[in-house]
């Protein structure tokens, strides 16, 4: 038996498809999402509707974004979901969530079992729309969830941790074994809740500067910041901000990265491209 076939659909490797089929896990995720009628619920990658059906049962209207044309067609003809669905057959990586929130007249509640092969770049795409998003619930590779929630001085702490926590409050919800999927992935999974900050705890003047600093620091994470960020900050400037130049990228808190970004935005602003 081909374990890549589920409910008559062949899982496409290039789309990173692993279909959720464990009812206890599904119920736990829907309970965590807690969808309510009248909310602007948006699912990324509904697949074979494992989450779409129980969420859709509670709603009058649900928006889904599905790249796979066969799966989008199945949803369109779904016996009870079909009339409730607004289906966008396109890539979530290029989707304009801001326009959708404007169209729906309220911030979006986004959820999904994300394809693991695009989960990190998709998170960064979504972060650029946090003004238009109320909250997000995602099934991700457990290692990615660990990176999202990691604090300084840990191996998992990296650029994704800093940027996620700059934009959102990040809360792990539950862990999910490979056996909950068809075909089973080779990794453990986990569900995470991300709630964009109503008020930024560490406001930055130019988020592009924060992105640049974290990229440069974590691309050379074994180097001290005296070396990895030496082209941006002198030892005197770092010391003046109370940041030890002998620290490495993983030792610096989100607040300190934001402090560094604001210094740079004021003293060496990026030119508009």
Swiss-Prot record:
GO terms for molecular function: 16S rRNA (adenine(1518)-N(6)/adenine(1519)-N(6))-dimethyltransferase activity; RNA binding. It comes from Escherichia fergusonii (strain ATCC 35469 / DSM 13698 / CCUG 18766 / IAM 14443 / JCM 21226 / LMG 7866 / NBRC 102419 / NCTC 12128 / CDC 0568-73). Belongs to the class I-like SAM-binding methyltransferase superfamily. rRNA adenine N(6)-methyltransferase family. RsmA subfamily. It catalyses: adenosine(1518)/adenosine(1519) in 16S rRNA + 4 S-adenosyl-L-methionine = N(6)-dimethyladenosine(1518)/N(6)-dimethyladenosine(1519) in 16S rRNA + 4 S-adenosyl-L-homocysteine + 4 H(+). GO terms for cellular component: cytosol. InterPro entries: KsgA/Erm, rRNA_Ade_diMease-like_C, rRNA_Ade_Mease_Trfase_CS, rRNA_Ade_methylase_Trfase_N, rRNA_adenine_dimethylase, SAM-dependent_MTases_sf. It holds the Pfam family RrnaAD. Its EC number is 2.1.1.182. It is an enzyme of class 2 (transferase). Its main location: cytoplasm. Specifically dimethylates two adjacent adenosines (A1518 and A1519) in the loop of a conserved hairpin near the 3'-end of 16S rRNA in the 30S particle. May play a critical role in biogenesis of 30S subunits. S-adenosyl-L-methionine binds at residues 18, 20, 45, 66, 91, 113. The keyword Glycoprotein does not apply. This is Ribosomal RNA small subunit methyltransferase A. HAMAP family: 16SrRNA_methyltr_A. Keywords: Cytoplasm, Methyltransferase, RNA-binding, rRNA processing, S-adenosyl-L-methionine, Transferase. It is found in: Cytoplasm. Gene3D superfamilies: Ribosomal RNA adenine dimethylase-like, domain 2, Vaccinia Virus protein VP39. The keyword rRNA processing applies.
């Amino acid at each position: 038996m081909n374990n890549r076939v589920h409910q008559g659909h062949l899982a496409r490797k290039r789309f990173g498809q692993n279909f959720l089929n464990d009812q206890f896990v599904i119920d736990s995720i829907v309970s965590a999402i807690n969808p309510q009628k009248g909310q602007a619920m948006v699912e990324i990658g509904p697949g074979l509707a494992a989450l779409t059906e129980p969420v859709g049962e509670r709603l009058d209207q649900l928006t889904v974004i599905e790249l796979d044309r066969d799966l989008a067609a199945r949803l369109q003809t779904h016996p009870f979901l079909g009339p409730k669905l607004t289906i966008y057959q396109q890539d979530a990586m290029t989707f304009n969530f801001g326009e959708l929130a404007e169209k729906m007249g309220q911030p979006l509640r986004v959820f999904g079992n994300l394809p693991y092969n695009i989960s990190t770049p998709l998170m960064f795409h979504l972060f650029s729309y946090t003004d238009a998003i109320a909250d997000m619930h995602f099934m991700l590779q457990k290692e990615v969830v660990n990176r999202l929630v990691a604090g300084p001085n840990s191996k998992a702490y990296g650029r994704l941790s800093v940027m996620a926590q700059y934009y959102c409050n990040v809360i792990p919800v539950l862990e999910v074994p490979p056996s909950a999927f068809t075909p089973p992935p080779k990794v453990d999974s986990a569900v995470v809740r991300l709630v964009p900050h109503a008020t930024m705890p560490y406001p930055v003047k130019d988020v592009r500067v924060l992105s640049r600093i974290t990229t440069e620091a974590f691309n050379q994470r074994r180097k001290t910041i005296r070396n990895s960020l030496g082209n941006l900050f002198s030892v005197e400037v770092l010391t003046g901000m109370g940041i030890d130049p002998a620290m490495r990228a993983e030792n610096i808190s989100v607040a300190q990265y934001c402090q560094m970004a604001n210094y740079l935005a004021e003293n060496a602003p990026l030119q508009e491209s």
